[in-house]
Every structure is written in structure tokens, then in C-alpha cells.
């Protein structure tokens, strides 16, 4: 499985794409020091080109704006290519990250992206137009985003399945 994920990774620095970035969450954290509390921020950011490339990143800094830019830079380093068929995913898949599970199902044209929060951000940045989702488990946005990325990394196009099984493409659908 690790080989497939590495195979899908795309070197974002070589590609000069028009990235769309979405801020999923901003979290203020505090550290208690001798003089009181010291606040810092962490952000979860999703970037994509709305054409099959998507990545997620976590940024931490003392100011919100620098945490967002660090998160976007981190997301561009973790970009994967995801398969798409008629604006939806090729098949039903469940992604897991810690206590978070996300179920993704293909949808017919005109349905739209039925998702909430971080899951919607990932799917829209990837370029999906019709997907049904269900978040099972945690409501933590960071784990939801990572579970969605894991689910998308597990999806396979029909051509990949045909090549792997060494059968013609028609046999994939007709058995």
C-alpha cells in the first residue's frame, strides 16, 4: 500500500499549477509560562487544482496568517493524484485516520457534494462535483481531512484494476 501512495504522490514544486486553498480549521493553543499564558495557533489547510490533485497540511505559528501560509506550504508538499470519473469517485471507499472514519460513495450527476466541513473542502479542492459522504467516528477536523485523503488514495480507476488483474477493460465491469 505504501508503494501505491508513493506512486500517486506528485512533486508539487515541479508543477506550476493554479492552486485553490481552503482553510478547514484554526485552533488556538496556549502554553502556561512563568509570566502567564503564551498563545499560538495551528491551522489545517487543504490545497488542490480542482482537476485531480489535492493535498493537506498543518501549520503552526504564533500568528494566524503565518500559520495559514505554513499550512498551505505543507499541503503543497503532500499532494496526491486522485482518480475521477464523470465528476465523482470510481467506487465506494472508507478512509480511516485514528478514530475518524469517512465513507465516500459515488453519486449521479446533479447530486452535488454532500459533505460537511473538512471532507467537503478536500473533495472540492480535488475537483469532485458529485459525491455522497458520511462521517463516522470523530468530529476532529484534522482526522476527518486525513481520513478523506486516505480514502481517496485507496480509490482505483478501472484501467488500474484491469492492468493489475491482467484482463481487458470490458471484463472489469462485466465479470
UniProtKB/Swiss-Prot annotation:
Part of the 30S ribosomal subunit. Contacts proteins S4 and S8. InterPro entries: Ribosomal_Su5_D2-typ_SF, Ribosomal_uS5, Ribosomal_uS5_bac-type, Ribosomal_uS5_C, Ribosomal_uS5_N, Ribosomal_uS5_N_CS, Ribsml_uS5_D2-typ_fold_subgr. GO terms for molecular function: rRNA binding; structural constituent of ribosome. Keywords: Ribonucleoprotein, Ribosomal protein, RNA-binding, rRNA-binding. Signal peptide: none annotated. The N-terminal domain interacts with the head of the 30S subunit; the C-terminal domain interacts with the body and contacts protein S4. The interaction surface between S4 and S5 is involved in control of translational fidelity. Belongs to the universal ribosomal protein uS5 family. Residues 19-82 form the S5 DRBM domain. PANTHER family: S5 DRBM DOMAIN-CONTAINING PROTEIN. HAMAP family: Ribosomal_uS5_B. PROSITE patterns: RIBOSOMAL_S5, S5_DSRBD. The keyword Lipid biosynthesis does not apply. The keyword Isomerase does not apply. One of its GO terms (cellular component) is small ribosomal subunit. One of its GO terms (biological process) is translation. It comes from the Bacteria. It comes from Salinibacter ruber (strain DSM 13855 / M31). This is Small ribosomal subunit protein uS5. It holds the Pfam family Ribosomal_S5_C. With S4 and S12 plays an important role in translational accuracy. SUPFAM superfamilies: dsRNA-binding domain-like (SSF54768), Ribosomal protein S5 domain 2-like (SSF54211).
